Amino acid sequence: LELYKKAAALDSVYGFFNVGFLYWNGPEEIQDPEQALQYLKKAAQMGYTYALSFIGDIYRTGPEELIDYAEAKRYYQKGVDVNEINAIKGMALLYLLGQGVTQNNAMGAFYLKKAADKGNAWAMYHLGRLYYYGEGIPRNPKLALDYLQMAYDANYPDACSLLGLLYERGEGTAPNIELANKLYIRGHELGDDQSMWYLACNYLDGNGLPKDYKRAEKLFIQAIERGNEPARIDLARMIFHGLGTVQDPQKAYEIIKPCLEQGYGRAYMLMGEVYENGLGVEKDYKQAKELYRKALDLGYSFAQEALDRLDKFC
């Protein structure tokens, strides 16, 4: 830091930038966002366009007393005007998150495409996601596949799981479960929790892979440890059914409980199945119906069939 300060004192643009960068993103004990702004603005004034996105980031993400979305947009726009890749990403985030502007995924996609066209893997992945889910733009699995493949080719780990899902479901391409599982395995190697979850499900159900309950259980646990909440539902399913493990409804409930608290419809669906079929608990069709109804209220449409089935019992 002191060496860069000496360079800044000699009016070195790199000195100003590096001091600003360290004050913003350096070791915690020297971080000082206000000082970072001063040095980064000086670097930007001297024509160092790379500083523009960092200034925008400080105004966009804080600390709270410095958040100013209008200023963030102003500096990002300066960067966009000179095709600075990180400023383009910052502008995309403003629109995708609705920070200081009306939330607009179409505008977000516009800036993501600009960044993707410049070879940015993060933008390729997020543009692929938008096209896959059709969030604010027309759903287009083929374009999703194209952008996710580009992100994967650029070694972006998160692309593995969604690209694999497209091949597994045959969306935008012919179904190819073998390739899907290879992508999940690669994602697992790269630490992608979603890939771990999908791979575990396929080991559990024997989908393109030999059934392997122990491997499935291990992968579900790894995914959960990395913050993948839906994997809890499938691990609980294994334990409620006693698949490759001792049936233990109390343990299974403790695993699935956070998903129930967070309103996952599929979690309520599983609990309905537990009471309908007496999986380690006494059968209770009334309780099952209440749980299926909750799942349906949370948007899990498959619960309707279960409700219709139970109508003849209660």
Task: Label the predicted regions.
Residues 1-3, 30-39, 65-75, 102-111, ...:
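Structural signature of tandem alpha-helical TPR/SEL1-like repeats
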Residues 6-7, 42-43, 78-79, 114-115, ...:
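Canonical positions in the second alpha-helix
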Residues 9-13, 25-27, 45-49, 61-63, ...:
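Short helix-capping/linker turns of helical repeat alpha-solenoids
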Residues 18-25, 53-61, 90-97, 101, ...:
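Hydrophobic face of amphipathic alpha-helices that form TPR/SEL1-like repeat modules
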Residues 221, 261-263, 271:
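Alpha-helical protein-protein interaction modules
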Residues 296-314:
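Terminal, low-structured helical/coil segments at or just beyond the last alpha-helical repeat
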